[in-house]
C-alpha cells in the first residue's frame, strides 16, 4: 500500500525547484563559474553541446542520442557529473522519469553533487528506487537524504515502505521479515514525529499501517501503534482495535476487569458486532449487574445488531431480578453508611452504575474509598467510569490516574486515552 503523503517525492524537479546549474559550454570561463569546478573531457563537452542544442529545439530524441554519445566518452567523475546535470535538465523538459532517475544516479554516484542539492536528489532517487521495487537502493538513498539534512517527514515514509517491501506480506512474524518490519516501523515513527515537529498533521493512515504491520509481525509495540491510531482518529472502531489487542495480551484478566474494558466500548460506540454486545452482557451477568445486562442487549437490538435470540438467555435471567434488586438499594445505602468497611458501599455503587444512576454511584464509590477494606484500584477505576459517563471528565481522569498497579492500571490507561479525545 502506498502512503498518502503531503508532498509526493515523485514530482519532477521542475515542480520542486527547477533545473540544476549546467553551463552551455560556450566558453571555459562560464564552465568554471557554475556548479562544482569540473575538468570535463573535450569529447564529452562536444556531445553535451549537441544535447543542449537539441533539447532547446524540443528534439528530445536527438538530445538523448547525444547524451548516450557523451556517456560512451565519459572518462572521469567530472564527466559523469556534468553529463548527469545536462541529462537531468533534459529529463525535465522531456518529462521523462526514467531519464531523471538515471541522471540523479549518475550525479550522486560521481560524488560531486553540491551539498545543498544532495538531500533532495537522494530523496527523489529513493522514491524512484521504491517505485522500481529496488528496496535496498531506496533505503540507501533515503538514509543518505536524511543524513544530508533533507526533510525527514518526506523521506522517512519512503524508507519505511522500502523496509516493508523487503518484509513482504507473508510469514512476516519470522526473521528476517520481522526485523525488516521493525525497522520500517522505526522509520514510520520518525516520519510521524518529524511531521508533528513541523506543525503538520500526520495522516491517520500511517498509524493504521503501523498497527497492521506490527500485528502481522507479532511485535509487542502493536498496542502503542493502536493507541496512536486511536488518538489520531478517535473512532469507536479504532478504540475497539485497541481494546481487543489489550484483551488478547491479557487473557487472564478477571471478569470484573473485563467488564470495565467492555464498558469503554459501550461508552465510545465501539460495540460493533453481535459478539461485542453478548460478551458485554455476559460479563455484566457474571458480576450480578442485572440492569447493565438489560441495557446492553436492548442497545444491540435497537441497532439491529442483535436478533431476538442473541443473548436471550442472559436477558431472560436478568430482567426478572431487576425490580427486586432496585428495591433493595435504598436499604443497602443505609447499611453502607453504618458498615465498618466499604464493601457494601462498593456493591451498592456497582448496582447504581449498572442502572445508569451515576450521581448515586459516585457517592457510594466515594463512601467505599472513605471506609476502606476494598480493592482501591477497582473502586478508582469504576469511580472514573461513573464520572466519565456523568460528564465529569476532569474528575474521571483524576480517578483513573489514582489506579496504581497491574492490569487495572492498563484498563485505566485505556479510559484515559479515551478521555484525551474529549479534551481531558
Predicted stretch roles:
Residues 2-106, 110-120, 124, 131, ...:
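N-terminal leader/linker segments that initiate helical-solenoid repeat arrays
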Residues 66-69, 97-109, 135-146, 172-194, ...:
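Alpha-helical repeat scaffolds
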Residues 3-7, 16-38, 253-257, 270-327:
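Long, contiguous interaction/recruitment modules in multidomain scaffold/adaptor proteins
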Residues 296, 300-303, 309, 313, ...:
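Flexible, glycine-rich surface segments
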Residues 54, 87, 91, 122, ...:
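Residue at a conserved register position within TPR or TPR-like alpha-solenoid repeats
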Residues 57, 94, 132, 166-167, ...:
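Structural motif corresponding to the intra-repeat A-B loop/turn of tetratricopeptide repeats
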Residues 40-49, 77-85, 114-124, 133, ...:
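Generic helix N-cap/helix-start motif at coil->alpha-helix transitions
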Residues 341-424:
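C-terminal soluble interaction/assembly domains
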